[in-house]
Amino acid sequence: MATPGSEPQAFAPALSVTALHPHLHQHHQHHQHHQHHGGTGGTGFNLPLNRGLERALEEAANSGGLNLSARKLKEFPRTTAPGHDLSDTVRADLSKNRLVEVPMELCQFVSLEILNLYHNCIRVIPEAIVNLQMLTHLNLSRNQLSALPACLCGLPLKVLIASNNKLGSLPEEIGQLKQLMELDVSCNEITALPQQIGQLKSLRELNVRRNYLKVLPPELVDLPLVKFDFSCNKVLVIPVCFREMKQLQVLLLENNPLQSPPAQICTKGKVHIFKYLSIQACQIKTSDSLYLPTIERPHLHQHVEDSKKDSDSGVGSDNGDKRLSATEPSDEDTVSLNAPMSNIVEEDQTIKEDACHRLTPTKGEFQPKPSILGDSGISGQEREQLAGRADARHSGLMNYIKDQAEDCEELLRIEEDAHWHMEELLNSSKDRELDIAMIEQLREAELLQDPNGLSADIIERSILNLFPMDSGEASEFPDPSLNGQLQLETSPDREVQNDLMLQSNGSQYSPNEIRENSPSVSPTANITAPFGLKPRSGSWCPEEVQGSLQAESSPRRPQLLSRHVFLRPQRNLESIDPQFTIRRKMEQMREEKELVEQLRESIEMRLKVTLHEDLGAALMDGVVLCHLANHVRPRSVASIHVPSPAVPKLSMAKCRRNVENFLEACRKLGVPEEKLCLPHHILEEKGLVKVGTTVQALLDVTVTKALFT
């Protein structure tokens, strides 16, 4: 018995037979049954058979297995010997012959279960093959079939082998083969698998090796495949859904230009491939959740008036979940965050600590009063009135603290918003030179002042000198350097406090002198304009609370006022270099940009190539730099790891090897050690300036040597 899917083997020998059934002879010949002429069965006459062929037919009649393999037959042999019927044949092997079509005689063997037509010249399969309703194994490999007929899909096949043909596609009716367990269509010209292949619910083994497939249909996931071979095709991506093929044990995928999973994963086997696909699936499912807003992130683009209405500082709140903000930030807010979350949280904590410091002594004043009054014999009604006053004072203090916390929160938001606007101004510096000059002056004024001796008179003078304009114009130029450092209210009480602060610090300028410097603008307008805030006419501080606060902190007047204007923590100013300015930073960035462009021009001019727009990514693998070293001096880098079509991206180990070889070549060529960059400057794409210095030194050294030789 022939083994399906492998090279055909001869059937077991059977008894001899001398003739076929007469009705088979009548189907193809219109001659008399009693004629006897010499020759083979291909002349149209009943010619005598050779002894070996007679023996094979005789064995088939008795055993049910017909073996006519490797006999150079061009058609099925015919004989007129009566009394022998081959219609009960179960197995037929006609492999390694010269048949050009499936013999019609075989289509009459209704009991046929296994048919092997391997290695013939078959181009046509007759529709009469549908008569073989017992056929379960069919081998049509190594023939010249250009298509499988639809009638073939009406058979109860379990094994179908059609490899090494010229098939361009599979019929859509292939989904009718419900009992098919093995399908081999390897070494053909198939460009796509039909969607109906997902209906083969019994398929265990699928071989589409050496075809022209570019896409694997996701319907394959529905199949209970144990072995899947799609090697030597043009597949670029393995669908993520393939991770659900739980019964798959053997996966063959070599010689494909796979991009996902990458070749490094594919070479490790099925387990790593499926793990990669699972990770990809998780990333796809959670891609939307990565942009979900978190309640801890502050608003950046919310209008100031809106934030005043619904912001919650967290002080006196019953629900801790409502801290920092009453509404969840939008996606735009989370994307445009510029400040680290740790700074925001620390600043909020500082605000709460300040509020607690103010609240604690005030509560201490109110709490002893009921006990003292109770001891002096005051009536219950008077006691309730006094308690009501105490509650009113306490609630007023809470509202005042809450208002101040809201103002601080607004400053934090506006500061980040102003920082974002400043970056936009810097990016469009050519069109807004006036704005940038003003920003630089403000930043210098902030950073060059003494961190430990920060006082309000310096701030007021710098603001009044730098903003000699009305509040409408000043609001158009938000400056982040002042945010979080001062916010002076327009109420009469606050103006009195400002005057006191200027006098207590020993300032040489009185409020009147300051107003003379800018007669058209009030100090309040100048101060609030940089923040873009409108004066709050309704903000007030209770007299009792204000008096208690002044009495408690009169020795520490500057510190109290600094809390009122919500200065940023001193740690930020202490960590800033006083010699640093925005102007110097911009000059440094301009120089670095020129060095990077010079690096690009040097490489492109030497190697006659056009580098990618992202220069860091183009140099990261070290290939271009090694070629540059070899261009300067041939064979200075002995071996270079280069990407291939199968592996378009080098591993990090190979990239590091290339970079180290380049740096070693630079040392040998005479580049000074202090001008050599480090490997991570190239590998991490974070030191293009240092890489440019190294490349320029390499070119200069070679030019110098060329002049002296």
UniProtKB/Swiss-Prot annotation:
The modification Phosphothreonine is found at residue 581. It holds the Pfam family LRR_8. Residues 589-702 form the Calponin-homology (CH) domain. It is found in: Cytoplasm. GO terms for biological process: cellular response to chemokine; negative regulation of GTPase activity; negative regulation of T cell migration. InterPro entries: CH_dom, CH_dom_sf, Leu-rich_rpt, Leu-rich_rpt_typical-subtyp, LRR_dom_sf, LRR_domain-containing. Its main location: cytoplasm. Residues 24-49, 301-390, 504-526 are annotated as: Disordered. The modification Phosphoserine is found at residues 395, 518, 522. Disruption phenotype: No visible phenotype. Mice are viable, fertile and have normal CD4(+) T-cell populations in lymph nodes and spleen. In an experimental autoimmune encephalomyelitis (EAE) disease model, the symptoms, such as paralysis, are more severe. GO terms for cellular component: cytoplasm. It comes from the Eukaryota. Signal peptide: none annotated. Residues 24-37 have a biased composition (Basic residues). Keywords: Cytoplasm, Leucine-rich repeat, Phosphoprotein, Repeat. LRR repeats lie at residues 60-83, 86-108, 109-131, 132-155, 157-176, 177-199, 200-223, 225-244, 245-268. Residues 301-312, 381-390 have a biased composition (Basic and acidic residues). Acts as a negative regulator of GTPase CDC42 by sequestering CDC42-guanine exchange factor DOCK8. Probably by preventing CDC42 activation, negatively regulates CD4(+) T-cell migration in response to chemokine stimulation. Interacts (via LRR repeats) with unphosphorylated DOCK8 (via DHR-2 domain); the interaction prevents the association between DOCK8 and CDC42. This is Leucine-rich repeat and calponin homology domain-containing protein 1. It comes from Mus musculus.
